[in-house]
């Protein structure tokens, strides 16, 4: 109803339950937010009758982690061994089925999907964020407890993926992708 009332030219869907530890405590809410929330946005897009450019964001955790050193590709399996990853994989599958069933045949809709990994910056002081936890512990002269200490975590400043999302939206709008 809101999308129909506002009639936006662009939709950027970045909403998510993004904390892995929370997904263990609140698995149903994580799936509801990440999968059903994405389906709700897609349902709103499916009912758009005007020209609209849409960018949906999931996560690099959408891929089934096979513990290799290379980046994942579009052809790699989605999934996950935990609720957060599984919810992001399920969101990707939901996007794909809406695309193939409805949106692909809608010439008025331009749709792109992007995935980012671990981001830092922008005032993110959420619980169970490694950089945040380190800063808080160091400021209190406390020992830092690292979850999954053998994991490799590539980082990017939040402005990098945001710039990419805006560029993707612009390129979709201009018909360059």
Predicted ranges, named:
Residues 25-43, 52-53, 62-119, 124-126:
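Catalytic helix-loop patch of NAD(P)-dependent Rossmann-fold dehydrogenases
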Residues 2-6, 44, 137, 164:
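CheY-like receiver
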Residues 33, 120-128, 149-163, 177:
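Substrate-binding strand-loop-helix patch
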Residues 103, 132-145, 155-177:
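Alpha-helical substrate-binding/gating segment
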Residues 9, 21, 28, 39, ...:
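Residues in well-ordered alpha-helical elements
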Residues 10, 40, 93-97, 133, ...:
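Alpha-helical elements of Rossmann-like donor-binding domains used by nucleotide-donor carbohydrate transfer enzymes
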Residues 11-17, 54-59, 114-116:
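SDR active-site strand-loop-helix element
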Residues 1-33:
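NAD(P)H-binding glycine-rich loop region in Rossmannoid oxidoreductase-like domains
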């Amino acid at each position: 109803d809101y999308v129909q009332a506002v009639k936006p030219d662009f939709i950027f869907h970045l909403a998510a339950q993004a904390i892995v530890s929370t997904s263990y405590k609140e698995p149903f809410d994580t799936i509801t937010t990440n999968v059903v929330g994405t389906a709700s946005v897609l349902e709103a897009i499916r009912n758009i009758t005007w020209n609209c450019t849409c960018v949906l964001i999931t996560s690099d955790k959408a891929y089934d982690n096979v513990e290799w050193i290379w980046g994942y590709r579009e052809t790699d399996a989605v999934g996950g061994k935990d609720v957060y990853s599984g919810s992001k994989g399920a969101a990707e599958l939901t996007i794909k089925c809406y695309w193939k069933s409805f949106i692909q045949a809608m010439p008025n809709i331009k749709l792109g999907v992007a995935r980012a990994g671990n981001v830092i910056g922008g005032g993110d002081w959420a619980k169970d964020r490694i950089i945040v936890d380190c800063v808080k512990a160091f400021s209190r002269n406390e020992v830092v407890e690292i979850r999954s200490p053998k994991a490799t975590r590539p980082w990017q400043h939040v402005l990098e993926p945001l710039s990419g999302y805006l560029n993707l939206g612009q390129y979709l709008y201009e018909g360059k992708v």
